[in-house]
Amino acid sequence: MRANFCLFIFILLFSCGQTYNTDNEETQFLNDFVEDDTTIEKTPLKTIKINTDAGREIVDEPKISAFFQIFQGENLIEEHNIGIEIRGSSSQYFPKKSYGFETWDEAGEDLDVSLAGYPEEEDWILYGPFSDKSLIRNVLIYRLSNLVGRYATKTSFYNLQINGVFLGLYVLMEKIKRDKNRVNISKNRSDDISGGYIIKIDKITGDGDTLNEKIAFMSEYTKDGIKGINKNVHFLYEYPKNRDISDEQKNYIQGYMRDFEDAIASENFTSESDGYKKYIDVDSFIDFFILNEITRNVDAYRISTFMHKDINEKLKMGPIWDFNIAFGNADYCEGGLTTGWAYKFNEACPADGMLVPFWWDRLMQDPNFTQALKERWTSLRLNELSNSSIMGIVDELVGELEDSDAITQNFGKWLILGTYIWPNNFVGNRHSEEITYLKEWIEGRLSWMDQEISKF
């Protein structure tokens, strides 16, 4: 309810005078809010240009046909036929949209291509950072995930132009799907239905926005671990898609999740042979926990939460997804604090419509799990997740944007520095202030986690 209320207020504010520089002209805003570094020679980002057939407006379903090009300056690098649509949930309320698109052949059929040097595929995303005025939160956490050995989508910064209109900074990303270069699990075949599967805990979008057995199944435990249907935790079929998954496959993955939940809810849940370890890859759960907790992601464990299972293997968490309101960028449900655990969301916002599954509380009650978590944390803090490692990536990403003048161009288009955009916990007048806040928040968060995990 609170999220919907905030979105309503957001829309109301923007309908009452919020303006954008749609022509990308020079404005006093640039002098007031973006650092003056005009004496430094810039190397512009590559530009993606998309032109829809007959200039049609891009909508949220169905995808419409368009022509996609990548330019370096005036030089054309590559071009493709695509089908494109608006994507996202709450982000669709923002004037700066994000897009999902497929690369197509001339007949409009899916076509795998090595887009921008990425491994061949046909499903892609153009993410437009808006409420995240650092511009780098998603890219940062995906880099960190890959650094600790957990696949996360590849990312690249681009300027975007659609039908001749400049739209600012975007991130070209891989869509999460089953593929040897993405979520590397086997195709689900009729001769062995033990895998692969991708399921996710998420909001219901599409299909009439109605929770039904065609698209999802529900947890059989309440947030407190009591047996009973829980409409606050439901599992969506991601692979095979709900239109493709057979009843036999549904029964298998539903049964597997039911057995896992029964095991972790049982009195002997720590048993090596009959407890939760029989069903899950513990190391993947630990890494997923760490990546979500260092960001205190307010959506963690309950929204945009992916899991996957391969043939004859245990359930694994991940890949991680959607951290634009993480790293202290949420002003509700304690999302802006550097203290407290994200997995304790249910205590902060018990009336929310999307709650954290009871498993995480249960896992943290197992001394063997917390000891393994402590050992993994200690190792990562000495290397991949050290302060210097994380700050080095932040500086690298910001440097790339500064060197290309992308920051000035983006905030020349979208005049939002110094303005609250839902659900900002901090509002900086300059981009550099947003980065300083991000760095200080991360350092505070890491310090708190060091102290708490040392007590395990």
Each PLM stretch: what is its role?
Residues D105-G108, P119-E121, G128, G149-Y151, ...:
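Internal "kinase-insert"/substrate-recognition segments embedded within catalytic cores
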Residues D60-E61, L111-L115, R137-N138, Y170-L172, ...:
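Short, solvent-exposed loop/turn and secondary-structure capping segments
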Residues N4-L13:
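Sec-dependent N-terminal signal peptides
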Residues F130-R150:
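A conserved alpha-helical element in kinase catalytic cores
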Residues P44-L45, R56-I58, E78-I82, G88-S90, ...:
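Middle-to-C-terminal accessory/interaction subdomains
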Residues I70-Q72, L76-D123, Y127-F130, Q249:
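Conserved oxyanion/phosphate-binding beta-strand-loop segments in alpha/beta enzyme cores
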Residues V148-N159, N297:
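Short, well-structured beta-strand/strand-turn elements
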Residues S15-I40:
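Bacterial Sec-dependent N-terminal signal peptides
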